A protein has these predicted regions:
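Protein kinase glycine-rich loop
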Residues: 22-27
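A glycine-centered beta->alpha junction motif in the catalytic cores
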Residues: 96-110, 164-175, 247, 291-311
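A cross-family kinase active-site recognition segment
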Residues: 110-183, 207
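Juxta-kinase regulatory segment immediately upstream of eukaryotic protein kinase catalytic domains
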Residues: 1-21
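ATP/Mg2+ or Mg2+-diphosphate-binding catalytic cores
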Residues: 160, 164, 168, 273, ...
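Active-site acidic catalytic loop and adjacent metal/ATP-binding pocket
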Residues: 29-38, 44-45, 79, 191-242
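ATP-binding pocket architecture of kinase catalytic cores
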Residues: 38-141
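Active-site activation/catalytic loop segments of kinase-like enzymes and analogous catalytic loops
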Residues: 241-276, 291-308
Length: 338
């Protein structure tokens, strides 16, 4: 097994028995996870591999937050403490955490009814409301670092990035269908940005504590009920309504790059009610996330700059969405605010 964790040392520290099976869980892009069965039970073993989030003290702070959320009834899977009373084990310079195994499956928006979509929005709204209760006041906290900065993208920087990516596409040999689609979308996006550059949003508004990475692979369902929100590595202070919009876009995008707007509407109504978020906050967030998508090329950067193709399968729908959203801007905004 590649990148095999030090099971003997970890299981002794946790008093979790002897390993029977240990299988990689392959959905994560930034960390490594394992389904671990031992003589004492079933667990999820997480190797905190991403250097941006792997500091043991920071991991333990997030662990304490999830335990407080669990105490408020939020469906999470707090980690287990080991024999030294901590929830992070550092072995060989690497940080690990052991969680109870949660039986469940991931579900995308196409598998949810409108009622279940509303329940999803209410869940995220409750998460935001509960985080305000269990986390320190925002005024004493620096905004989280990560892929969603408060300052909106500068189109001048995006034009330069498009030119650089087009250079990568031209140099890739042999050219393939992905290169052809990438070139088409880059040229298309450049034209859209030239047309809409004056619509760049101002700096973000109201911030709050957010999960930071709320999407289908970080939510487990048992039957029709959310069983656990996982992967709190990006917990931090960000514009909270932007997380709500961003999550809706990920959950409810269709394979052709359109959004299921009736489900978005049900989700957004429930979110606003649970989080106490006004419609104006959602409207501003929708505009900022639209602009973010118009300027975002992380999947192409992974492909061409890192040689990492794990996100390639997401690119056709994600790249088509930016174009469709621009064309249907008013309808999308209306779905988030009414």
């Amino acid at each position: 097994m590649p990148h095999a964790p030090p099971l003997g040392a970890l299981l002794r520290l946790y008093g979790a028995g002897t390993a029977v099976t240990c299988e990689p869980v392959d959905q994560g892009l930034l960390n490594r996870g394992y389904r671990l069965c031992t003589t004492r039970g079933r667990y999820f073993l997480k190797h905190h591999f991403d250097p941006d989030t792997a500091d043991p003290a920071a991991i333990e702070r997030r662990h304490r937050a999830t335990q407080r959320l669990a105490d408020l009834g939020v469906p999470v899977a707090p980690p287990l403490a080991h024999r030294e009373g901590r929830t992070v084990a550092v072995v060989g310079g690497h940080a690990y955490a052991l969680h109870p195994w949660i039986d469940g499956r991931h579900r995308h928006g196409g598998q949810l009814t409108r009622g279940q979509s509303a329940r999803l929005g209410a869940l995220l709204g409750a998460v935001h409301a509960c985080l305000e209760r269990v986390m320190p006041p925002k005024v004493h906290t620096r905004p989280a670092t990560g892929p969603h900065p408060v300052r909106s993208a500068d189109p001048a920087d995006t034009f330069a990035l498009i030119d650089a990516l087009l250079g990568h596409v031209r140099r890739h040999r042999p050219a393939d269908a992905f290169d052809e689609l990438a070139r088409h979308r880059l040229l298309e996006r450049r034209a859209l940005l030239e047309q809409h550059a004056a619509r760049r949003p101002p700096r973000g508004g109201s911030v709050g504590w957010v999960h930071g990475d709320f999407h289908p692979f970080n939510l487990l369902y048992k039957d029709d009920t959310p069983a656990a929100i996982v992967d709190w590595d990006r917990l931090g202070v960000q514009p909270r309504a932007e997380e709500a919009v961003r999550a809706a876009v990920i959950f409810f995008v269709r394979p052709g790059g359109t959004l299921d707007l009736p489900k978005v509407r049900a989700y957004a109504r429930a979110y606003r009610r649970a989080a106490g978020a006004p419609s104006a906050e959602l409207a501003a967030a929708a505009h900022r996330v639209w602009w973010e998508r118009l300027n975002d090329f992380w999947m192409l950067r992974w492909h061409y700059e890192r040689g990492d193709t794990r996100a390639d399968c997401q690119f056709p729908a994600a790249s088509a969405l930016a174009v469709w959203w621009t064309r249907e801007y008013d309808a999308v905004c209306d779905a988030f605010v009414r």
